[in-house]
Amino acid sequence: MVRVDIETIVMAAGPVPSLIVLRERCGKSDSTAPLRSLSIQTGSFEAAAISRGIDSGRAECPITHDLLLDTVDALGAKLERIEIVRAEPPVFYATVVVLADGSEHRIDARPSDAIALAVRSNAPMFVEDDIMNRLGTVSAHAEEVDDEQEFEKFDEFVHTLSPDDF
């Protein structure tokens, strides 16, 4: 398994899917190795739920992801981690791993829901090695890329997209 963090969320509207871009964490053994990123398509509401979990934490009135985490907590369990376990592009499959009474429980989930839960609970996120090897793209370290260049590259990329690309 490869440990990942959210690199960015690209919000879209209408029929165009949003993207969640996960980037592998820098390995301790070789910090100069290029990092890989994995893009997962999702709906705009799902992307907004993840973004809301990152940006503002809990809503005044709990939304579904908050409610589920409150339930897990009330039962004395803990969201241990989430895993992206299978991919049949453009569809990805995830597992939420919950620790309760000393036992691990693996629950099937959509990646967007699993990620939304992870960001709210600070649970680590992982991607199967095979998925990252097949579908990950090599990217430069974020620190080495000038922000202006990054925005220009992204702008160029966005202008080349059409709805048929998704």
Model-derived segments and spans:
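Divalent-cation
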Residues: 1-166
